Amino acid sequence: MTTDIVWPPPVRQVRAYRNIVVDGACNIRCTYCEVKKTKVDQPATIRSLDRIFAEYEPDAVLFRVESDGEITLYPKIVDHLQKRAAEGYRVEVLSNGTKLPRALEGRPDLLWVFSVDGHTEAMNAKRGLKQPQIDRILDAAVELGAELQTVYWGQPVEEVNAYIDLLESRGYRGLLHFMPLLAFKGRPLTVNLRYQDLHPADFLAPPEYFRRWNHIFETGRRDAVCDQITNGYNYQVSGDEIRMVKCDCYSVPKHLVHGFGPIREFDDWPCGTCIANQEFNNSRERMRVPQGRIPLPLV
């Protein structure tokens, strides 16, 4: 018997992940969010964004750009992100979707992630969204294949499954990412969502994600390493000021936050009890480098 040996063996390559959070106000009042009043200097913020982009080769990184509030309230910033995306940078924008469909106009090169807690007003009770707003978000997500980020705060599983079924029936081809209402200051999670209770769908996170969530809920401890730690880094932008940190989880020690410069790697990051969208980041389609193209460093 002969066996064909392929050499070198196929390797799935992924981009680096860089999360950029800019200052911003918000136009909704989620009961689980901490919103601070702030004045945003858009030209200064754009200069800081360009300093960050200059550190990387286009298409070698997936940038996730979001705001402490709602980024589409700052059109000059989003327009600049579109410009950089058109130049070859891979940029996804996290939005609460309240400015749809206008927020999409003239920005064809951006990737989108929309925050919505389900398909009904009841599921979005903590966000205060009305049904027409929810419908516009889901319409855009289905049309664009945009990712959906859903906070699970205790909605009935029957409603969660109805949400999954609706997206399945509409041919949704993005990623539906459930994340628990975070526990502040390292306290154990207060909500649990089990994979075996959910209707199967290709757009859900893998079963291992939910197993990790269940473990943290039951024990108050982690037993696995998040992809943010293996392949991610965070930038916090406030006008001309840029701060950096490996992960911006709640209660991160202040001495681990540093000024703009080289990234710092850690053998033992002090993870708390959070679990969020970065957990299986490397498995996302947006993170994958196309087959047959291997970016090599300049030497």
UniProtKB/Swiss-Prot annotation:
SUPFAM superfamilies registered for this protein in UniProt: Radical SAM enzymes
Gene Ontology biological process terms in this record: antibiotic biosynthetic process
Pfam family name, one: Radical_SAM
Top-level taxon of the source organism: Bacteria
PROSITE patterns membership: MOAA_NIFB_PQQE, RADICAL_SAM
Bilayer-spanning residue ranges: none
Keyword Cytoplasm: no
Catalytic reactions of this protein: neomycin C + AH2 + S-adenosyl-L-methionine = neomycin B + 5'-deoxyadenosine + L-methionine + A + H(+)
Binding site for [4Fe-4S] cluster 1: 26, 30, 33
Domain Radical SAM core: from-to ranges: 10-222
Gene Ontology molecular-function annotations: 4 iron, 4 sulfur cluster binding; isomerase activity; metal ion binding
Functional summary from the UniProt entry: Catalyzes the last step of neomycin B biosynthesis, i.e. the irreversible epimerization at C-5''' of neomycin C to give neomycin B. To a lesser extent, is also able to convert neomycin Y2 to neomycin Y1.
Family per record: Belongs to the radical SAM superfamily.
Name under which the protein is recorded: Neomycin C epimerase
